[in-house]
Amino acid sequence: AIGKMLKDKHGTDVRVLPAGNDVARLQPLRTGRAFASAMGAGVYFAQEGLFEFGSKEWGPQAVQLTLTTVDCNAGSLGVAADSGVKTVADLKGKRVGFVVGSPALNQNTLGVLAFANLTAKDVKVVEFASYGAMWKGIVNNDVDAAYGTTITGPAKEVESSPRGIVWPPTPPDDKAGWARLQKVTPFINPHLATCGAGISKEKPVQLSNYPYPIYTVYANQA
C-alpha cells in the first residue's frame, strides 16, 4: 500500500527486499541497499544494542522512526485450535515457536507467556529460521503457537487449515498478568482486536499490541 502511494503521488518505484528476522531486516538499511525498513519491536533493541544487536558487529544503532500505526489488529500468540488451548496458562507444556535472530518475536512471545507466569522453561521451544517458517510449522503440526499480528497472511492460512486458530486473551483487568507482561515487553499495551484471523467486530478478543510496523531509517538519512 505504501509502495502504491509513493508511485501514485511521487512517481517513485519501490522494490521490496524480503527478510526473515530483525537482523536481516536492518542489514540492507545499514549497508545502503535500502532506504527504509519495516521493523517490529526489533528496532527498539537495535537502538539500545540489545540481544542480537548487542554483538560487537552491531551495538547501538542510530535508527529513527518515520511512520507507524495502531489499528484494529493486535499482536499476540496465535495458537492451533486443535491444541485445546483456551488461555495463555494452557500453553504450559505446548510447543511454542521461536525465530533464530529475531529478538522482537522472541521477546514478544516471552512477554505473552509471562502474562500467565510462564517462561520458556514451561513450554517446548521449537526454533525456526524465519517468521514464515514458524507459522507454516503450525499448519504442518510441528508447533502449536507462534507470535504474530492477527491480520498476517500466515495466520489466515492457519485459520483456513484443518488445525484452525485461536488467540488466548490477555484481559486488561488482570493487573498482575499485565505487570508481568510489561516487565518483559514494556512497549506492549492492552488492545481490543476487532479484525484478523478468527476475529471480527462481532467477535473481538482482548489482546495486546504496539505500533506496528515501524518504518525505520538511520538518523543520517532523515
Predicted regions and their residues:
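Extended interaction regions within the primary functional domain
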Residues: K7-H10, R25-P28, Y44, E57-G59, ...
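Short, flexible turn/loop "capping" segments at secondary-structure junctions
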Residues: T69, V88-D90, L207-P213
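Extracytoplasmic
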Residues: G11, N21-A24, T31-A34, P60-Q61, ...
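Conserved hydrophobic/amphipathic secondary-structure segments
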Residues: A36-G75, A114, V166-L181
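Bilobed "Venus flytrap"/periplasmic-binding protein-like clamshell domains
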Residues: A1-R15, C72-D144, I151-G153
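Pocket-flanking alpha-helical
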Residues: G3-K4, R15-E57, V85-K86, G132-G137, ...
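Pocket-lining segment of extracytoplasmic ligand-binding domains
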Residues: A41, E52, S83, K121, ...
